[in-house]
């Protein structure tokens, strides 16, 4: 810790960082505001699995203060890439990684899947406009049990992943293990169920993106636990631009527990290519914030597992 010298092993140490937080002097993303800042609200899927039949944004675009209403078509026209998968864990055959985009195209695959991003002068205006967006869905069969998802006739979630299997992970010597079981006098079996888990930090995720038209660069302020990795993912996979043209900053983080290590779509929404998502006319900064309930619906979770 800063300002401490000497041998501290085996001794109680006085923490140096707590006073600032306990006296309300912490600075979180929601404490920041940029002149001319716009506000973004995302409309999410209420279905676990459905086809997107139609999106009507006309009423939302006509509402007061609305700067833009964006769908997956805007991702395509701006050349915004899919969010990368950083957990390459397959050991048997190459891992199948379907493209996870910042806004769903044609199909939603989980409750909370982002579909439309609305930008307006104020957060209430953006929220009202999001409610005016009309999305027609055709519900599809869905499963919530991983074992059922691997069944022969289970509904297919991704065309790229036959049988809903992304990867197989194995470690150790299977032959030696089989031989040990063959020699064992007794074999005991037990099923362990690891329940669904949702990480719930006090501070939900938030992001503020600023575009510098003169330099052609982005500045992204977010609730993150690994700015260097997030910056590299945005540059290489999402915006396809030189690393030095993207700055990612994280102020104080109100709890993370690992869930804020990942790149979420909010970074794409708040920046967008050439500042077009923030404002088609002047590249105004854009902010997207989540309350606790949407945070749970839009955060990486650990599903129920069987061992």
Where are these regions (language model features)?
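Short glycine-rich loop/turn motifs
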Residues: 38, 104-105, 203-208, 300-301
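Beta-strand segments within the central parallel beta-sheet cores of soluble alpha/beta enzyme folds
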Residues: 72, 244-251, 278-288
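Acidic, glycine-rich active-site loops and adjacent beta-strand->loop/helix elements
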Residues: 75-76, 224-227, 251-256, 285-292
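Phosphate/diphosphate-binding loops
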Residues: 114, 121-122, 278-307
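Conserved beta-alpha junction segments in alpha/beta enzyme cores
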Residues: 176-238
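Thiamine diphosphate
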Residues: 256-277, 282-284
């Amino acid at each position: 810790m800063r300002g401490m010298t000497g041998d501290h092993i085996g001794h109680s140490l006085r923490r140096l960082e707590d006073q600032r937080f306990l006296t309300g002097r912490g600075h979180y993303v929601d404490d920041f505001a940029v002149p001319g800042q716009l506000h973004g609200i995302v409309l999410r899927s209420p279905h676990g699995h459905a086809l997107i039949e139609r999106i009507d944004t006309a009423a939302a675009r006509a509402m007061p203060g609305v700067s833009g209403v964006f769908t997956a078509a805007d991702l395509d026209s701006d050349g915004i890439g899919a969010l990368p998968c950083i957990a390459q864990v397959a050991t048997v055959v190459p891992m199948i990684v379907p493209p996870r985009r910042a806004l769903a195209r044609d199909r939603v695959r989980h409750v909370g899947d982002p579909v439309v991003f609305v930008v307006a002068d104020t957060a209430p205006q953006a929220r009202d406009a999001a409610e005016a967006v009309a999305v027609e869905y055709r519900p599809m069969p869905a499963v919530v049990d991983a074992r059922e998802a691997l069944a022969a006739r289970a509904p297919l979630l991704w065309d790229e992943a036959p049988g809903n299997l992304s990867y197989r992970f194995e470690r150790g010597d299977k032959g030696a293990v089989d031989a040990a079981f063959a020699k064992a006098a007794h074999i005991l079996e037990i099923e362990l169920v690891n329940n669904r888990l949702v990480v719930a930090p006090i501070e939900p995720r938030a992001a503020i993106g600023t575009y510098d038209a003169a330099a052609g660069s982005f500045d992204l302020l977010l609730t993150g636990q690994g700015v260097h990795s997030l910056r590299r993912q945005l540059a290489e996979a999402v915006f396809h631009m030189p690393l030095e043209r993207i700055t990612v900053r994280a102020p104080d983080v109100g709890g993370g527990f690992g869930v804020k290590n990942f790149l979420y779509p909010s970074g794409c929404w708040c920046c967008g290519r050439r500042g077009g998502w923030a404002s088609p006319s002047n590249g105004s900064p854009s902010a997207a914030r989540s309350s606790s309930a949407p945070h749970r619906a839009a955060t990486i979770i650990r599903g129920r597992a069987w061992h």
